[in-house]
């Protein structure tokens, strides 16, 4: 019996593939558990259409991420914080703080999860920050932590 896999099935195939399996295996295991559906040309067209839509969505997401990254890399971003003598910051600069400050200056909608900090920044100075945007776009940007006047 020909089936179209709705999920990845170990030792059988990946989602969307058309496979020939025994009738009993299809009727008693794959179809009742929602792993596959019986093959029809209409179902195959629907799955191909779904894959095409998903591919376009990922491409759009990647393009959008590349635009955002290009905008972020244009300059060194400044984060102003309250600091004491010797450049020690009151509190710490976290990924959320960085995302918020850059959003204010650039007008971009940024998510704190896109910025990777090994540990919170506790001193004034310049830092390189890894940015990991949706669509697999990664790079580093520069930020400068300055004393708030």
UniProtKB/Swiss-Prot annotation:
It comes from the Bacteria. Disulfide bonds: none annotated. GO terms for biological process: translation. Keywords: Ribonucleoprotein, Ribosomal protein, RNA-binding, rRNA-binding. It holds the Pfam family Ribosomal_L9_C. InterPro entries: Ribosomal_bL9, Ribosomal_bL9/RNase_H1_N, Ribosomal_bL9_bac/chp, Ribosomal_bL9_C, Ribosomal_bL9_C_sf, Ribosomal_bL9_N, Ribosomal_bL9_N_sf. Belongs to the bacterial ribosomal protein bL9 family. Binds to the 23S rRNA. This is Large ribosomal subunit protein bL9. It comes from Thermotoga maritima (strain ATCC 43589 / DSM 3109 / JCM 10099 / NBRC 100826 / MSB8). The gene is rplI.
């Amino acid at each position: 019996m020909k089936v179209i896999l709705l999920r990845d099935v170990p030792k059988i195939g990946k989602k969307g593939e058309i496979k020939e399996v025994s009738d009993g295996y299809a009727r008693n295991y794959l179809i009742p558990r929602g792993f596959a559906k019986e093959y029809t040309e209409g179902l195959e067209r629907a799955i191909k259409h779904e894959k095409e839509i998903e591919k376009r969505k990922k491409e759009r997401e990647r393009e959008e991420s590349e635009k955002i990254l290009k905008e972020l890399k244009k300059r060194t971003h400044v984060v102003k914080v309250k600091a004491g003598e010797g450049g020690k910051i009151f509190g710490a600069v976290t990924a959320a703080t960085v995302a918020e400050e850059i959003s204010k200056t650039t007008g971009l909608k940024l998510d704190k999860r896109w910025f990777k900090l090994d540990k919170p920044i506790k001193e004034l100075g310049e830092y390189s920050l890894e940015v990991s945007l949706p669509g697999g776009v990664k790079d580093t940007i520069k930020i400068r932590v300055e004393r708030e006047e």
